[in-house]
Amino acid sequence: SNERDLFSLIDYFPNDTYVVSLRAPIKLFNDSYAWYDIYVEGNNKFYDHEAAAHVRDKLYQFIDDLSKNQNINAENITLIGFSQGAILSHAISFSYPEKIKNIMALSGVVDEKIMKKTSLIPKTNIYISHGTNDNLIDYETSKKSLNFYKGNDIDFKFESFEQGHGMNQQNLESMMRWLKEKI
């Protein structure tokens, strides 16, 4: 995916929403980018957790700088992440719980290995969706990763949709209804 994908959704956001969409630094192919490298050996996929944690911190610093230097309500920041962006959104909200109000994590997983250890439990509103036919990030793996939130008594909304590694109209409408209730 790339940074332009979010702008195709702009009409669904409330008029006073300040939208920032970032391009990940690693070019994969055509118009697709990644935040960190993914390695595949047989049926196993893995990535460098240290590199992902470094990206997490850089993204947080960008968010912090942006909220200080622009006319943005620093207490009403929502992260929307797809795939790696979803993984990073989970990590940012738990690593910096005082900064993020909402996350919308689409087709990703919760990975504790890239979360900073903190004693604060985030008050972040969390929306998670995943396609039941996702062949890139397994649906069942995504559901199992939610045990992290359940184990820490953190409330979240999870929805599944009959789709692959993407977002369909039903998913879009549902997540935007959720967001409008939260902002």
Whereabouts are the PLM-identified features?
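Gly/Ala-rich beta-loop-alpha elbow adjacent to hydrolase catalytic centers
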Residues: 81-85, 89
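Serine-hydrolase catalytic machinery in alpha/beta-hydrolase-like enzymes
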Residues: 1-72, 76
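Short beta-strand/loop motif that positions the catalytic acidic residue
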Residues: 128-130, 134
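Active-site signature of alpha/beta-hydrolase-fold catalytic machinery across serine-
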Residues: 8, 91-95
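Short beta-strand immediately N-terminal to the catalytic nucleophile in serine-hydrolase-like folds
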Residues: 79-81, 106
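C-terminal catalytic histidine-bearing segment of alpha/beta-hydrolase fold enzymes
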Residues: 127, 140-183
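Flexible "cap/lid" loop of the alpha/beta hydrolase fold
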Residues: 31-39, 108-126
